[in-house]
């Protein structure tokens, strides 16, 4: 396995550009040092607010994005609807493992959702593998991933909006909103929105 990864790194883009979003400055510094020393990557930014992170992401189009945040801090809707670039790998570090959260975000295009307490060597291996593995391509043309409408609706539901309000804001029938909700949950292998909320 290590040989395959090493061979892949040799053919991968040299000095991949990594963007780190971690509101905790110490966490951001630790991740930056890890990326530069172990992954031979270029850290292009460590924004600590969501608006700055999204702005930097759009401007720089990184090769990998690492979000070292607690997804329960009312940012799940934004994570589901982040700008997506087919050549970029998205990794989320969380405070605790959750199958439901992993399924929800991997169906949104995240490469991995991992517990930040995992051993450093294992974390390094996951990040290295993320840079080596081929991307999923255009998620808007892949049936494994949410449709744009499904992303928006899941994000709105996680924000506490009701289906009727979402339908009015989108200008589509209530029944269509309900259908998008259920197809989104099925894609992620989930039964209800509460599985994500309780993660």
What kind of feature is each model-predicted range?
Residues 1-135:
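N-terminal regulatory/sensing modules of transcriptional regulators
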Residues 126, 180-183:
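Residues within the DNA-recognition helix of helix-turn-helix
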Residues 132, 136-140, 190:
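Charged, solvent-exposed alpha-helical segments that act as regulatory interaction surfaces
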Residues 139-179:
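Helix-turn-helix DNA-binding segment
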Residues 185-199:
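Basic, Lys/Arg-enriched C-terminal extension of HTH/homeodomain DNA-binding domains
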